[in-house]
Amino acid sequence: MRVLVSGGGTGGHIYPALALIREIKKLNPEARFLYIGTENGLESTIVPKTGIPFQSIVISGFKRKISLDNVKTVMRFLKGVQDSKRYIRRFNPDIVIGTGGYVCGPVVYAAAKLGIPTIVHEQNSVPGVTNKFLSRYVDKVAVCFEAAAEHFPQSKVVMTGNPRASEVMDQNGMKGKRSVGLSLPKKSVLIFGGSRGARPINDAFVEAIEQFGNKSYEILYVTGEVHYDKVMEAVKQKGNPNNVIIKPFIHNMPEVLTGVDLVVSRAGATTLAELTALGKPSVLIPSPYVTNNHQEKNARSVVDKGAAKMLLEKDLTAETLIRDIDEILLDAQTLQNMKLAAGQLGIPDAANKLYEVMNKLVKK
């Protein structure tokens, strides 16, 4: 099987693509890949490091207001389609999959027009502009949230989940807890604000640290590397309780996620895929700084099923943070109910499901 993959702009589009590629390599060692991204996007540094052949095109997104830039974007799109067709003809893929971001537009559109089987993968509950546009032309639209399905032609929608979920399975949670200094018998909560951290969550944590010191559970707090020194400076003035462990970054996140009892985090699509695959209850603090407020809508999909609580950033204080953690961790029945609800939402074999959809299209 020859697979052309395109996705870029943010890690939320790139890492699911790479997780899918790794799964296909396991199931089909003979498979060959080409990844098309943008020259300056995050994918241009991440993908080549994995050894996957990479090509780039020039593309940008539409501005929401009428502007001359949109004329340039149309011109870039048309040029991107021509460049994509050239790469496609040269690589001769059996199937093309787009995982989101502007770069998918010309690549997947070009493939569809050339009669090659095509799929787009939508990670969020609210689809991006590119995937909505492409849904008219592709063979299948793979989704991770039921709420996303209503935005696409129903005959094309398949629920596969996020391939990243498959990569957190079969991890050693006890090893994960030991690696960060958590004790095995005690309940624990992991609090983090994404790979770069989140200042409002850091501020609430610092305010809460003295009260956390009186709790029977342990707290693992991940600041994000850019915030670590500032947080530790503030913590020194208040004191660091024995049951609170602070780290700038965690390199073995799947192991640690497996080991803890509760997670407090943003509501990015990849994070939710991992948490539900593991059956982890969560307190979700959606980032209000994302397109279409999609994190709040992602969170709502999990909260409505009883697998999480949602704490909006505008309501985030030391008191509300501790309240929500206590209500879950200190009540065994609530904790168990939320674990079951999260597990029912999870799709741990998402990468395999997506590969099956691809296989069916190729064999048609």
Swiss-Prot record:
Q: Does the keyword Transferase apply?
A: yes
Q: Supply the EC number(s).
A: 2.4.1.227
Keyword Transmembrane found: no
The protein's annotated catalytic reaction(s) are:
di-trans,octa-cis-undecaprenyl diphospho-N-acetyl-alpha-D-muramoyl-L-alanyl-D-glutamyl-meso-2,6-diaminopimeloyl-D-alanyl-D-alanine + UDP-N-acetyl-alpha-D-glucosamine = di-trans,octa-cis-undecaprenyl diphospho-[N-acetyl-alpha-D-glucosaminyl-(1->4)]-N-acetyl-alpha-D-muramoyl-L-alanyl-D-glutamyl-meso-2,6-diaminopimeloyl-D-alanyl-D-alanine + UDP + H(+)
Major location (coarse): membrane
Associated pathway: Cell wall biogenesis; peptidoglycan biosynthesis
Per UniProt, UDP-N-acetyl-alpha-D-glucosamine binds at T10, G11, G12, N124, S195, I250, Q295
Q: How does it sit in the membrane?
A: Peripheral membrane protein
Which domain of life does the UniProt lineage start with? Answer: Bacteria
Q: Which family does it belong to?
A: Belongs to the glycosyltransferase 28 family. MurG subfamily.
Protein name (record):
UDP-N-acetylglucosamine--N-acetylmuramyl-(pentapeptide) pyrophosphoryl-undecaprenol N-acetylglucosamine transferase 1
Taxonomic lineage is:
Bacteria, Bacillati, Bacillota, Bacilli, Bacillales
Q: Which gene encodes it?
A: murG1
